[in-house]
UniProtKB/Swiss-Prot annotation:
The active site is at H88 (proton donor). Pathway: Cofactor biosynthesis; riboflavin biosynthesis; riboflavin from 2-hydroxy-3-oxobutyl phosphate and 5-amino-6-(D-ribitylamino)uracil: step 1/2. It comes from the Bacteria. PANTHER family: 6,7-DIMETHYL-8-RIBITYLLUMAZINE SYNTHASE (PTHR21058:SF0), 6,7-DIMETHYL-8-RIBITYLLUMAZINE SYNTHASE DMRL SYNTHASE LUMAZINE SYNTHASE (PTHR21058). (2S)-2-hydroxy-3-oxobutyl phosphate binds at A85, T86, R127. Catalyzes the formation of 6,7-dimethyl-8-ribityllumazine by condensation of 5-amino-6-(D-ribitylamino)uracil with 3,4-dihydroxy-2-butanone 4-phosphate. This is the penultimate step in the biosynthesis of riboflavin. This is 6,7-dimethyl-8-ribityllumazine synthase. GO terms for cellular component: cytoplasm; cytosol; riboflavin synthase complex. The keyword Secreted does not apply. One of its GO terms (molecular function) is 6,7-dimethyl-8-ribityllumazine synthase activity. Its EC number is 2.5.1.78. Forms an icosahedral capsid composed of 60 subunits, arranged as a dodecamer of pentamers. It holds the Pfam family DMRL_synthase.
Length: 154
């Protein structure tokens, strides 16, 4: 039996990060976490392309452009959505997650989900580097593992 698992080394890999500017104080912490994860796992900052977009709605289209680049091994999507009083949150959260999943399947390239979807500001803060870890770091770790897995499967 052959078993494939992605290695947790970023050495020699190139990553794209697409990050929204909306809720930038929290998004910046997620971006810092993602970059820290890549570097701690042997990657280099010069092998990371960071693209800033206005909000989470724009993340999938920019992620698709990055993922189409042959020199990018994986894309990390980063944003923060906080529920408000209207259904806007539900529409954005649903479409962003579906858009990223569909792109990853269509392009056959890892696109990981580092978009916090929180009911409250407190929940978002907890997931941006405090009580519940840093979701940017976690998304980067998944990107490292999946990029290596794809390389071994091809």
């Amino acid at each position: 039996m052959q078993i494939y698992e992605g290695k947790l080394t970023a050495e020699g890999l190139r990553f794209g990060i697409v990050a929204s500017r909306f809720n930038h104080a929290l998004v910046d912490r997620l971006v810092e976490g993602a970059i820290d994860c890549i570097v701690r796992h042997g990657g280099r900052e010069e092998d990371i392309t960071l693209v800033r977009v206005p909000g989470s709605w724009e993340i999938p289209v920019a992620a698709g452009e990055l993922a189409r680049k042959e020199d990018i091994d994986a894309v990390i999507a980063i944003g923060v959505l906080i529920r408000g009083a209207t259904p806007h949150f539900d529409y954005i959260a649903s479409e962003v997650s579906k858009g990223l999943a569909n792109l990853s399947l269509e392009l056959r390239k890892p696109i990981t989900f580092g978009v916090i979807t929180a009911d409250t500001l407190e929940q978002a803060i907890e997931r941006a580097g405090t009580k519940h870890g840093n979701k940017g770091w976690e998304a980067a770790l998944s990107a490292i593992e999946m990029a290596n897995l794809f390389k071994s499967l091809r």
